[in-house]
Regions:
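Predominantly soluble domains enriched in secretory-pathway, periplasmic, or organellar proteins
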Residues: 1-365
Length: 365
């Protein structure tokens, strides 16, 4: 990548080498990858299923059914065997705990209000769920070993909603994208978590809010631990990226992204923190995080919905609203050019592969 004062490096993907994986379960709302890079999980909210994809063969390895309108999915960096999925019914929203090795739903945690996003602490002990209610918004904190629930109040005013929740690399702070009648904001929460994973006495608390003019669409955290990138969008101004110093709780730069003409929906950072992938209606726009200059576009699908990089930073996985997963090798990657072993772009056969079973251990009480 380029230095701030040097020429901007360009970014591009060889579309001829992209592998398409038909999931066959309608629009994909969210995607995550296991910390070992072996599995991808995608939520198919229209078909009440979650699909598990083997990243080695680029085929659907299994489908977990019976999950009502699954939306957000999060996996723990501490354990590749478990995933957390938000679901919604007319009566309640819930967090489903899934063993992705055995494909079993091992626990269900019913919650009040409407869930908007999920995040897992680095040690896997705490699960954070941003929620929206008729009168305000909050974050629910689940202890994954005891099932205890803590609620962090964000706002008690009607019309205030959460867009997303992110947790810092040390687990000590949460960052929540919040929208209200007067615009968006970034709420900063102290979690009272020590570096050894245990809790300091007292409760988690809101310690600050960075006000933004436009509705927040997504938040991503830089690798330095002190920077948050906030993507926002409005019908008149368009798409904007704000860079926030999380220590001082101030905006250090604002960049309008004229290259994005449609509505901005999601944002994800590359593993090295050098690039921001911004998803809009028909493309993924790639920005350099140092200068916020546009480096290029990813057009592997017509209507992208979510994406994630592989843990080693070699591959980009892009899901779309047609139920298709595109696998592309990143230009900076060091892996072989072929993104999948033994996969055919036109082969939509479901693989019967299952990994070796690991010993079962409880996640949530």
């Amino acid at each position: 990548m380029s230095d701030a004062n040097g020429p901007t490096a360009r970014f591009g993907i060889d579309n001829t080498a992209v592998v398409k994986v038909p999931v066959h379960h309608g629009p994909i709302s969210d995607i995550d990858v296991s910390p070992d890079g072996r599995r991808l999980l995608v939520t198919n909210y229209g078909r009440d299923t979650v699909s598990v994809i083997d990243t080695h063969t680029c085929r659907v390895a299994s489908t977990i059914a019976g999950l009502s309108e699954p939306f957000a999915v999060a996996m723990s960096a501490a354990d590749p065997n478990y995933a957390y999925v938000s679901t919604a019914t007319a009566a309640y929203d819930a967090i489903e705990v899934i063993d992705v090795v055995t494909n079993w739903r091992i626990a269900t945690h019913r919650l009040a209000h409407s869930l908007s996003d999920l995040a897992v602490s680095p040690d896997g002990r705490y699960l954070y769920a941003s929620r929206n209610a008729v009168r305000g918004a909050d974050v629910a904190v689940l202890d994954t070993t005891t099932g205890e629930l803590e609620v962090i109040e964000l706002a008690a005013a009607a019309g205030t909603t959460t867009a997303c929740v992110r947790v810092s690399a040390d687990g000590r702070r949460l960052f929540v994208g919040v929208n209200g009648p007067n615009g968006g904001g970034l709420a900063i929460i102290e979690t009272r978590t020590r570096t050894d994973g245990r809790r300091v006495g007292g409760r988690s608390r809101l310690v600050g809010t960075v006000e933004l003019g436009l509705p927040v669409r997504d938040v991503a955290l830089g690798n330095d631990g002190n920077t948050a990138y906030v993507a926002s969008c409005g019908p008149v101004v368009g798409s904007v990226l704000d860079v926030v110093d999380t220590r001082a709780a101030t905006i250090v730069s604002t960049h309008k992204i004229n290259e994005i003409t449609g509505p901005l929906t999601r944002m994800t950072l590359s593993r090295d923190g050098e690039r921001a992938y911004l998803i809009s209606d028909d493309r993924v726009t790639v920005l350099g995080t140092r200068t916020q200059d546009v480096l290029g576009e990813v057009r592997v699908t017509k209507h992208p919905s979510a994406l994630v990089e592989s843990p080693d930073g070699n591959y980009l996985y892009v899901a779309d609203h047609a139920g298709l997963l595109s696998v592309a090798r990143l230009p900076s990657g060091t892996a072989p050019a072929a993104p999948c072993s033994g996969a055919d772009e036109d082969d939509d056969a479901t693989s019967g592969w299952l990994p070796e079973l690991a010993p079962w251990e409880p996640v949530l009480a």
